[in-house]
């Protein structure tokens, strides 16, 4: 992943690893890894606000942490996923994940981080003909891990920027 910082303009550029995690050169960041679970569900044409789609996304996030080798997980997202990962195969995982995110928000009042936004890009491409469906999808997916309404608002705006640009 590419992180902020100065890079000297000498020599031949090369792909670097590192960043905020122990990434190999060319390895995707944790946020990109998570966005692939959203993309897999979106690629089916599913309504990303539906219980079934959100359950599949939430299940994917949990599989990523438990089984697929998450290379790094943000502190807030880790706390939410850890609260539900053991019940990932039971029905209603998305509702339990949203409840865990809401509980964390109630306890800390500090859950407006950028994690939901970092994996939101794909959502802006899913309903190009419907800004309201795009907004609802962005908020629904964001709320799986980020209960602060500002996090959802940022995802709605970001998804709409992408949708309208396309």
Residue ranges and their predicted role:
Residues 1-166:
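Structured, active/binding-site neighborhoods that engage oxygen-rich ligands
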């Amino acid at each position: 992943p590419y992180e902020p910082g100065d890079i000297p303009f000498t020599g031949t550029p090369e792909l670097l690893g590192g960043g905020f995690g122990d990434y190999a050169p060319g390895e995707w960041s944790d946020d990109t890894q998570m966005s692939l679970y959203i993309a897999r569900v979106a690629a089916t044409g599913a309504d990303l606000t539906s219980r079934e789609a959100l359950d599949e996304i939430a299940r994917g996030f949990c599989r990523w942490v438990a089984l697929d080798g998450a290379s790094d997980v943000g502190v807030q997202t880790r706390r939410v996923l850890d609260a539900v990962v053991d019940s990932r195969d039971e029905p209603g995982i998305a509702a339990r994940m949203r409840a865990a995110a809401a509980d964390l928000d109630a306890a800390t009042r500090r859950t407006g981080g950028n994690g939901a936004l970092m994996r939101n890009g794909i959502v802006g491409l899913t309903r190009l003909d419907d800004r309201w469906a795009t907004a609802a999808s962005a908020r629904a997916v964001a709320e799986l891990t980020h209960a602060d309404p500002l996090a959802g608002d940022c995802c709605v705006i970001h998804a709409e920027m992408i949708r309208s640009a396309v």
